[in-house]
């Protein structure tokens, strides 16, 4: 298995991201990691005694693929993909298209990654737009949220495709036979929301009546109900989904800080035990990035401010998707759902 890692274009240091590759390579002995970085970054990696020693001792475990350009966070997505063809991001996607990589992980420009994936990698049958799929913790386990930033605005038919992909993901990866699917809305009633959301509600309800449908559409879900775990798949447009995701990240950080302050009067051991349990469950860095769902390859988008641990989780998530043959399973699930 070959996994590509883009070290460039994020708000994190490339060396921080390479540390994740180094940690992954120590444990994932059946994986070859292809690192994409500019020559100055490659030089810094080789200047690090720990990294340099590992590269010399295990030359086949990490391949360094120098690139000459970088797509920055503030670059216009489509233009940058077309003009910066030798950037780390575009090079990684081209390697995926040529079947020289089994998966690709980047913490770079989200819009450029999605635009590049759409332009360079075939879409799955029946899917018109890719979407970012991420997971959030709830009272009853993780919920899949789709879309969390791929499409600022969506037609009703796109939301239906997102629902199908999210449900297929839950069946493939978590073994939920008939996932509960809900539309994120401002109220529970079917007449609430924008015209596209109302139309999507009707389309999903119609799909529910199909005898072969493998999802359980329960209707609209309000924001406060998301974390109660009332659904397995939460469907929304990318603008709203991204706001939900980043708000939940901020709230979790705030609550952990407040709790840490509140626990100052109990024993250090008790406090550390409680905080570790909550940190493992609610810290967004513990989750394996967002999947670009709808393309015919495994591409994972990590947080733009990823720590080495967050990037490591993204890398491990991509490896797991490839090992589980996620794309083939997703194709099969979507084929059944659209019959």
UniProtKB/Swiss-Prot annotation:
Pathway, per record: Lipid metabolism; phospholipid metabolism
Location(s), subcellular: Cytoplasm
Catalytic activity as recorded in UniProt: a fatty acyl-[ACP] + phosphate = an acyl phosphate + holo-[ACP]
Single Gene Ontology MF annotation: phosphate:acyl-[acyl carrier protein] acyltransferase activity
Family matches, as InterPro entries: FA_synthesis, Phospholipid_synth_PlsX-like
Top-rank lineage group of the source organism: Bacteria
Gene3D superfamilies: Isopropylmalate Dehydrogenase (3.40.718.10)
Primary site of residence: cytoplasm
One of the GO BP terms on file: fatty acid biosynthetic process
Subunit structure: Homodimer. Probably interacts with PlsY.
Assigned protein family: Belongs to the PlsX family.
Record function comment: Catalyzes the reversible formation of acyl-phosphate (acyl-PO(4)) from acyl-[acyl-carrier-protein] (acyl-ACP). This enzyme utilizes acyl-ACP as fatty acyl donor, but not acyl-CoA.
NCBIfam families in UniProt: plsX
Protein name according to UniProt: Phosphate acyltransferase
Naturally occurring in which organism (per UniProt): Protochlamydia amoebophila (strain UWE25)
